[in-house]
């Protein structure tokens, strides 16, 4: 049997872990939705190119903001409404007037669109909006919202299509508001909570003489000695005369949100046809410590603005080399223990989680390591049952951000009674040098294997403790050397 490449096995294993457990839905604007949810903009850019940043792990699973049923009588507690109390989505609970990208909206009929990755039977959808006098610099709580939904759509206890749109009459508001969309699933005791950051701008454009042409997204921290700058394009191409450069000359400026703010300030100080910042209630461009939209003056012939970097130092590498994981472990009267070795590339934290085939977590270890450091780790499984298991290895940088993830498969097998000794010639790898065509050995999995005839019999003796590809039953290419009896 031809062994699948490791990369394919990794993909299959990852899909088993995450594909079924983390597939639900989110508020989108793919077809006719008025605005994307906060979590959606963590993964997908808006039509303006704007995205939310520093969202944590939920940026990889925007469909998974799932929490307890029954809002507002029950459901997520105050301060945890945006995350629905999901640990994946903790960052979504941050709340200030300038933390999140906002989408323009108007009072009256608006379409709200949901995209589903698993279209559960649905009880209903409800839409709430913040009160006119809410405080955008306090965590979202029930007191922030008008707790009478402005729109309720009956789900009929049937499965919706993979994308649905609801036309709702949005109440009159001014400035920055938050809409809470709640999808009440009919076949579980959970609901999905998506907050939508919107800004009411009246019936016409707030600044008709300006159009958005780019944005400053604080995607990464920089180092002292680096430079961040604007690349401005007009009808003829890039025009260096409009460039604004910011030298990163202090530790404070290395922080992503700080240099984004400083670059926006410098643009506003040095440019007359380019402005940066979020538009406030007085129609002023105010630089923020986060994503800063860039606007171009009408009639300037300027087309767009991009952000460039001059990086003086290479980006750090983060990785871990894992060894010691066997492809198979036999179950006995003591719990199965994995004895592993880790070697770090970069200053990292390695998280190791063992799952069985049913995706139950059986063991967890978190190991902080310095660059080049080696550490031994033992993981004792809380349950030992025969079948497929997975070891998920996550590499986090010093800021706790996920840099790499891989999944390794292994099996637990029941202990087998060894066959009679006269059924085999050797217990592998005893007598290795004398193996020839027809030699029978007892392998580590308790089965008997016979060395293949010439010309394959030469593979039977090709084994060392560090080169095990032809080891009967467990090596990556054992079928080239042996027949299982």
Curated annotation (Swiss-Prot):
Gene (name only): gbpA
Signal sequence coordinates: 1-29
Family: Belongs to the GbpA family.
Name by which UniProt lists this protein: GlcNAc-binding protein A
Main location: secreted
GO molecular function ontology, one term from the record: chitin binding
Spans traversing the lipid bilayer: none
Disulfide topology: none
Function summary: Probably interacts with GlcNAc residues. May promote attachment to both epithelial cell surfaces and chitin.
Organism whose genome encodes this protein: Vibrio vulnificus (strain YJ016)
């Amino acid at each position: 049997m031809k062994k699948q490449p490791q990369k394919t096995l990794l993909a299959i294993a990852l899909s088993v872990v995450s594909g079924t457990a983390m597939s639900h839905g989110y508020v989108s604007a793919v077809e006719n939705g008025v605005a994307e949810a906060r979590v959606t903009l963590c993964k997908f850019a808006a039509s303006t190119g704007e995205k939310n940043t520093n969202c944590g792990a939920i940026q990889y699973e925007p469909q998974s903001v799932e929490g307890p049923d029954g809002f507002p009588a029950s459901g997520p507690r105050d301060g945890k409404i945006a995350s629905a109390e999901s640990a994946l989505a903790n960052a979504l609970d941050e709340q200030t007037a300038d933390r999140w990208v906002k989408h323009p909206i108007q009072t009256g009929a608006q379409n709200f669109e949901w995209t589903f990755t698993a279209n559960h039977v649905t009880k209903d959808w409800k839409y709430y909006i913040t009160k006119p006098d809410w405080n955008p610099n306090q965590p979202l709580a029930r007191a922030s919202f008008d707790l009478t939904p402005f729109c309720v759509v009956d789900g009929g206890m049937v499965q919706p299509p993979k994308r649905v749109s609801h036309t709702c009459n949005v109440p009159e508001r001014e400035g920055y508001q938050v809409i809470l969309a709640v999808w009440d699933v009919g076949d579980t005791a959970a609901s999905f909570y998506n907050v939508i950051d919107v800004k009411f701008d009246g019936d016409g454009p707030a600044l008709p003489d300006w159009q958005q042409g780019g944005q400053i997204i604080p995607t990464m921290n920089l180092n002292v000695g680096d430079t961040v700058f604007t690349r401005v394009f007009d009808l003829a191409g890039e025009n260096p005369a409009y460039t604004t450069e910011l030298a990163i000359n202090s530790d404070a400026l290395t922080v992503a949100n700080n240099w984004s703010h400083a670059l926006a300030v410098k643009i506003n100080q040095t440019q007359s046809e380019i402005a940066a910042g979020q538009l406030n209630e007085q129609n002023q461009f105010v630089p923020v410590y986060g994503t800063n939209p860039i606007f171009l003056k009408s009639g300037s012939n300027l087309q767009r603005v991009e952000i460039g970097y001059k990086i003086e130092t290479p980006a750090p590498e983060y990785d871990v080399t894992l060894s010691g994981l066997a492809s198979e472990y036999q179950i006995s009267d003591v719990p199965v223990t994995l004895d592993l070795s880790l070697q770090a590339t970069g200053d990292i934290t390695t998280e190791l989680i063992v799952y069985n085939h049913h995706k139950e977590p059986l063991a967890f270890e978190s190991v902080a390591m310095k660059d080049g450091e080696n550490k031994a780790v033992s993981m004792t499984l809380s349950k030992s049952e025969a079948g497929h298991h997975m070891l998920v290895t996550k590499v986090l940088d010093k800021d706790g951000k996920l840099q790499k993830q891989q999944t390794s498969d292994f099996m637990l097998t029941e202990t087998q009674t060894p066959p009679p000794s006269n059924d085999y010639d050797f217990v592998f790898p005893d007598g290795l040098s004398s193996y020839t065509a027809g030699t029978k050995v007892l392998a580590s999995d308790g089965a008997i294997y016979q060395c293949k005839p010439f010309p394959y019999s030469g593979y039977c003796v090709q084994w060392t403790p560090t080169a095990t590809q032809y080891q009967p039953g467990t090596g990556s290419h054992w079928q080239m050397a042996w027949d299982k009896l």
